[in-house]
Amino acid sequence: MLAVVVYESMFGNTHVVADAIGKGLGEGLESVDNVVVLPVVEAGRAQLGDADLLVVGGPTHFHGMSRPRTRKWANATAQKPKNDLVLDHDAQGPGVRDWLTSLGHGHTKFAAFDTRFKGPAVLRGRASRLISRKLRRHGFEMVAKPESFFVTLQNHLEPGEEARAQEWGKRLASILLSDGVTHAVRDNRPHPRRCDGRGDDPDPG
């Protein structure tokens, strides 16, 4: 079996989470050879290959997935003096939003995750909800509810979140190894109100 983790990361938090999920998947599938972790910029159709599970994640910006203007904001934030934030190696590449648009139709099982500030999702938003919605529209089958991993107000990963991401990866592996059809889930909760982001800070990860 093959699991592919695709991520977008600005300050490295989502990258760390993606790697931890990949590690958990590898432990659950009993082989790291069964797991590939890729930044969005490297995740073409050929790289997805014959994946049995697709895991997609990105930072929450202005209640949803990043846009060019929010990635530009993150870049400017990292350049500020006396700032310990460092842009991820692939931060300048395309975001998950654009990647999903170009992905096309598929039937692969999937799970989605995001990084965001703590707080009610209706106020903070969750990129993972929108990622899941896009993938379902493309025909992919959701096997786990969207998951959030939290960052501090200084845009660093909260303590314990890396380990939690690894455990989530193990749970995804368990789902993949069992009868996936019985684990298919639907996310029928009301979607949060769309927000233009004015007066709010994005949650880059």
Question: For each predicted feature, which ranges?
Answer:
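Glycine-rich phosphate/pyrophosphate-binding loop and the adjoining helix
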Residues: 136-205
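N-terminal beta1-alpha1 ligand-phosphate binding loop
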Residues: 1-29
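Short histidine/acidic/glycine/proline-rich micro-motifs that form metal-
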Residues: 11-12, 116-122, 150-153
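Residues at the starts of beta-strands that form the adenosine-phosphate
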Residues: 1-2, 34, 109, 141
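Helix-loop-strand module that forms the ligand-binding subsite of alpha/beta enzymes
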Residues: 40-138
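Short, well-ordered alpha-helices that flank and scaffold nucleotide-derived cofactor binding pockets
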Residues: 19, 23-27, 133, 137, ...
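A short beta-strand-loop structural module common to alpha/beta enzyme folds
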Residues: 28-44
